[in-house]
A protein has these predicted regions:
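Intrinsically disordered, low-complexity terminal regions
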Residues: 1-158, 162-177, 181-242
């Protein structure tokens, strides 16, 4: 990526992150009182998708039992929402949080097919998430860091967000745009398809096949020695072997 492209991307992402940051003490939203308490919440319906938003920190654990605990400032519990609708667990808030000592969600689940993080939220796995097909999405300054074991993983990252993956998969689909990053050098895949544009970066590790397309100041970096490689470099895009 050229110096001017990096500067423009950094400027745009800074503006996005400022608009999406919910834990900055700018006086907008509810301020936590600093008295942290942990409360268990019941989940009465089945779900196989999770959507996290509004700057919350979520820790995911695949388990035989389903459970959900909220660790947050005492006065924030009433505005943190956790509800299942049409098989989707939505974790969010009714109001913005301007400052908090803690705003953690600890979720244990059995099976999952889709995880989406948006609006400055952070998502982490505490163990390896096993699934046949898994769809992952980060946007609007959010971060996701997962260890996975899948047949197929389809991931997308946009608007200054970061997605970091480790583990193993048979096939990886990766799509990054608008200054976002997909960091999957520690995810061992057999077949990978990667598309990056608008100042985004993708790093991956593939053994058998690679299809890569980079345009508009984007970079795709790959580890491994795939036997079949198809590369398409657009305007100021780079595809680089590591």
């Amino acid at each position: 990526m050229t110096t001017i492209s990096k500067f423009i991307t950094a400027l745009i992402m800074s503006l996005l992150l400022v608009s999406c940051q919910f834990n900055s003490d700018f006086g907008f939203g509810v301020r936590g009182n600093g008295d942290v308490e942990t409360i268990e919440r019941s989940i009465d319906e089945n779900f196989n998708e999770i959507i996290i938003s509004r700057g919350l920190d979520v820790y995911l654990t695949q388990s035989d039992q389903v459970s959900l605990h909220v660790e947050a400032d005492e006065n924030l519990h009433d505005i943190i929402t956790t509800k299942v609708e049409n098989g989707i667990l939505r974790i969010s808030t009714d109001e913005n949080i301007s400052f908090s000592k803690s705003k953690k969600i600890m979720l244990s689940f059995k099976d999952i097919s889709k995880i989406k993080a948006t609006s400055g939220s952070d998502v982490y796995s505490t163990n390896t998430i096993v699934a046949d097909n898994l769809e992952l999405s980060t946007t609007s300054g959010s971060d996701m860091e997962l260890d996975i074991n899948t047949q197929v993983v389809d991931c997308s990252s946009t608007s200054g967000s970061d997605l970091r993956l480790s583990g193993i998969t048979n096939k990886l689909y990766a799509n990054a745009t608008s200054g976002s990053d997909i960091k999957a050098e520690n995810l061992k895949s057999k077949i990978s398809e990667a598309r990056a544009t608008s100042g985004a970066d993708i790093t991956l590790n593939t053994s058998d096949e690679l299809y890569a397309k980079a345009t508009s100041g984007a970079d795709i970096k790959y580890y491994g020695n795939p036997e079949k490689i198809t590369k398409k470099d657009g305007v100021s895009g780079n595809i680089i072997k590591q």
